[in-house]
Protein backbone atom coordinates (compact mmCIF):
# COMPACT_ATOMS: atom_id res chain seq x y z
CA UNK A 1 0.00 0.00 0.00
CA UNK A 2 1.12 3.51 -0.78
CA UNK A 3 0.64 6.68 1.25
CA UNK A 4 -1.77 9.35 0.01
CA UNK A 5 -3.35 12.62 1.00
CA UNK A 6 -6.57 13.88 -0.54
CA UNK A 7 -8.33 17.17 -0.16
CA UNK A 8 -11.64 18.18 -1.65
CA UNK A 9 -13.75 21.31 -1.54
CA UNK A 10 -17.53 21.06 -1.50
CA UNK A 11 -20.02 23.73 -2.57
CA UNK A 12 -20.98 26.12 0.24
CA UNK A 13 -24.68 25.76 -0.61
CA UNK A 14 -24.88 22.24 0.84
CA UNK A 15 -26.61 21.75 4.19
CA UNK A 16 -24.83 20.01 7.06
CA UNK A 17 -26.43 16.60 6.40
CA UNK A 18 -25.38 16.71 2.74
CA UNK A 19 -21.81 17.61 3.67
CA UNK A 20 -21.59 14.75 6.17
CA UNK A 21 -23.08 12.39 3.59
CA UNK A 22 -20.51 13.39 0.93
CA UNK A 23 -17.62 13.01 3.38
CA UNK A 24 -18.84 9.56 4.45
CA UNK A 25 -19.28 8.54 0.82
CA UNK A 26 -15.64 9.30 -0.04
CA UNK A 27 -14.40 7.65 3.16
CA UNK A 28 -16.36 4.53 2.21
CA UNK A 29 -14.87 4.56 -1.30
CA UNK A 30 -11.40 4.40 0.25
CA UNK A 31 -12.24 1.68 2.77
CA UNK A 32 -14.26 -0.45 0.31
CA UNK A 33 -11.20 -0.62 -1.93
CA UNK A 34 -9.12 -1.94 1.01
CA UNK A 35 -7.69 1.47 1.87
CA UNK A 36 -6.97 2.54 5.43
CA UNK A 37 -7.74 6.10 6.55
CA UNK A 38 -5.10 7.07 9.10
CA UNK A 39 -6.62 10.42 9.99
CA UNK A 40 -8.70 13.24 8.56
CA UNK A 41 -9.21 16.95 9.06
CA UNK A 42 -12.61 18.55 8.74
CA UNK A 43 -11.47 22.09 7.97
CA UNK A 44 -14.97 23.49 7.60
CA UNK A 45 -16.18 26.43 5.55
CA UNK A 46 -13.42 28.72 4.29
CA UNK A 47 -12.93 31.50 1.79
CA UNK A 48 -11.54 30.39 -1.55
CA UNK A 49 -8.40 32.04 -2.92
CA UNK A 50 -10.37 32.80 -6.08
CA UNK A 51 -13.92 32.30 -7.29
CA UNK A 52 -14.74 28.76 -8.48
CA UNK A 53 -17.99 28.14 -10.36
CA UNK A 54 -19.36 31.44 -8.97
CA UNK A 55 -18.60 30.42 -5.36
CA UNK A 56 -16.37 32.46 -3.05
CA UNK A 57 -16.43 29.95 -0.19
CA UNK A 58 -16.15 26.20 0.09
CA UNK A 59 -16.19 23.36 2.61
CA UNK A 60 -12.70 21.83 2.94
CA UNK A 61 -11.95 18.24 3.95
CA UNK A 62 -8.56 16.46 4.07
CA UNK A 63 -7.82 12.75 4.57
CA UNK A 64 -4.52 10.91 4.98
CA UNK A 65 -4.75 7.27 3.93
CA UNK A 66 -2.96 4.18 2.65
CA UNK A 67 -4.29 2.42 -0.44
CA UNK A 68 -3.43 0.46 -3.54
CA UNK A 69 -2.68 2.67 -6.56
CA UNK A 70 -5.52 1.11 -8.58
CA UNK A 71 -8.09 2.69 -6.24
CA UNK A 72 -6.96 6.26 -6.94
CA UNK A 73 -8.40 6.34 -10.47
CA UNK A 74 -11.82 5.38 -9.13
CA UNK A 75 -11.64 8.00 -6.36
CA UNK A 76 -10.70 10.72 -8.86
CA UNK A 77 -13.46 9.59 -11.25
CA UNK A 78 -16.02 9.91 -8.46
CA UNK A 79 -14.74 13.38 -7.56
CA UNK A 80 -15.05 14.49 -11.20
CA UNK A 81 -18.64 13.32 -11.71
CA UNK A 82 -19.94 14.86 -8.48
CA UNK A 83 -21.23 18.38 -9.19
CA UNK A 84 -20.96 19.29 -5.50
CA UNK A 85 -17.14 18.94 -5.55
CA UNK A 86 -15.60 22.27 -6.58
CA UNK A 87 -11.97 21.07 -6.50
CA UNK A 88 -9.99 18.04 -5.41
CA UNK A 89 -6.42 16.83 -5.24
CA UNK A 90 -4.79 13.49 -4.49
CA UNK A 91 -1.12 13.55 -3.49
CA UNK A 92 1.04 10.41 -3.54
CA UNK A 93 3.97 10.17 -1.10
CA UNK A 94 6.62 7.88 -2.63
CA UNK A 95 10.17 8.43 -1.43
CA UNK A 96 11.34 7.63 2.09
CA UNK A 97 11.57 11.34 2.86
CA UNK A 98 8.03 11.97 1.56
CA UNK A 99 6.63 9.06 3.58
CA UNK A 100 8.30 10.46 6.71
CA UNK A 101 6.67 13.82 5.97
CA UNK A 102 3.31 12.03 5.53
CA UNK A 103 3.71 10.41 8.97
CA UNK A 104 4.55 13.82 10.48
CA UNK A 105 1.40 15.31 8.92
CA UNK A 106 -0.70 12.44 10.28
CA UNK A 107 0.80 12.88 13.76
CA UNK A 108 0.16 16.62 13.69
CA UNK A 109 -3.43 16.12 12.47
CA UNK A 110 -4.11 13.62 15.25
CA UNK A 111 -2.89 16.04 17.93
CA UNK A 112 -4.77 19.13 16.72
CA UNK A 113 -8.57 19.45 17.07
CA UNK A 114 -10.22 20.38 13.76
CA UNK A 115 -11.58 23.73 14.92
CA UNK A 116 -8.81 24.68 17.35
CA UNK A 117 -7.86 27.74 15.31
CA UNK A 118 -11.39 29.16 15.52
CA UNK A 119 -11.52 28.59 19.29
CA UNK A 120 -8.10 30.23 19.69
CA UNK A 121 -9.20 33.27 17.66
CA UNK A 122 -12.36 33.64 19.77
CA UNK A 123 -10.27 33.48 22.96
CA UNK A 124 -7.85 36.13 21.64
CA UNK A 125 -10.75 38.37 20.59
CA UNK A 126 -12.35 38.10 24.04
CA UNK A 127 -9.01 38.77 25.72
CA UNK A 128 -8.19 41.83 23.55
CA UNK A 129 -11.71 43.22 24.10
CA UNK A 130 -11.26 42.84 27.87
CA UNK A 131 -7.88 44.63 27.72
CA UNK A 132 -9.36 47.56 25.77
CA UNK A 133 -12.11 47.99 28.38
CA UNK A 134 -9.54 47.95 31.19
CA UNK A 135 -7.38 50.57 29.46
CA UNK A 136 -10.34 52.87 28.84
CA UNK A 137 -11.41 52.64 32.49
CA UNK A 138 -7.88 53.48 33.61
CA UNK A 139 -7.65 56.55 31.36
CA UNK A 140 -10.86 58.07 32.78
CA UNK A 141 -9.55 58.01 36.34
CA UNK A 142 -6.60 60.32 35.55
From Swiss-Prot:
GO terms for cellular component: cytosolic small ribosomal subunit. It comes from the Bacteria. InterPro entries: Ribosomal_bS6 (IPR000529), Ribosomal_bS6_CS (IPR020815), Ribosomal_bS6_sf (IPR035980), Ribosomal_S6_plastid/chlpt (IPR020814), Transl_elong_EF1B/ribsomal_bS6 (IPR014717). SUPFAM superfamilies: Ribosomal protein S6. GO terms for molecular function: small ribosomal subunit rRNA binding; structural constituent of ribosome. Coiled coil: none annotated. Pfam families: Ribosomal_S6. Disulfide bonds: none annotated. GO terms for biological process: translation. Residues 110-142 are annotated as: Disordered. PROSITE patterns: RIBOSOMAL_S6 (PS01048). HAMAP family: Ribosomal_bS6. Binds together with bS18 to 16S ribosomal RNA. This is Small ribosomal subunit protein bS6. It comes from Helicobacter pylori (strain Shi470).
